[in-house]
Design a protein with these regions (language model features):
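Juxtamembrane helix-loop transition sites at the ends of transmembrane segments
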Residues: 43, 54, 90, 105-107
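Canonical helix-turn-helix DNA-binding module
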Residues: 41-83
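Short, cationic-aromatic polyanion-contact patches
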Residues: 21-26, 43, 76-99
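N-terminal helix-turn-helix DNA-binding core of bacterial DNA-binding proteins
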Residues: 15-54
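Amphipathic alpha-helical dimerization/coiled-coil segments
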Residues: 14, 92-112
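N-terminal leader segment of winged-helix/HTH proteins
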Residues: 1-21, 68-70, 85-87
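Short, structured secondary-structure boundary patches
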Residues: 2-4, 12-13, 46-49, 62, ...
Length: 112
């Protein structure tokens, strides 16, 4: 995919994601990373490190994705600040990622 062409259409893609999937771009990135890591359980801090976004809060996105039933979240028994994501539904995640790529491909093919 041509990066410059993608960037030129980034706002259109963001609007389409919100309209069709009710998700933000960051939520798609989080799902892509969860799918890539393929772990049954992951600490939210570890996920942030893998995303390379230590200074960006992702709690709103985590809550939204959890509300959609893509995974469950729970607090650590000994340290309430730690949040674990578990029971990750990889089949739903893969389906959403596939829809994302379809949306992007459709937008980029219409613009060319």
């Amino acid at each position: 995919m041509d990066t410059i062409y993608y960037e030129e259409n980034r706002n259109t893609i963001k609007r389409a994601l919100k309209k069709n999937l009710d998700m933000s771009f960051l939520e798609i990135v989080i799902l892509e990373k969860l799918n890539y890591l393929n772990k049954e359980k992951i600490d939210a801090v570890e996920l942030k490190k893998h995303l390379n976004i230590e200074n960006t809060p992702i709690s709103v996105q985590i809550n939204h994705l959890s509300d959609l039933g893509l995974f469950k979240k729970s607090r650590d028994v000994y340290d309430e600040r730690r949040i674990f994501l578990h029971d990750i539904d990889f089949s739903k995640i893969k389906s959403i990622i596939k829809q994302y790529h379809l949306i992007v491909d459709t937008i980029l093919s219409r613009k060319s």
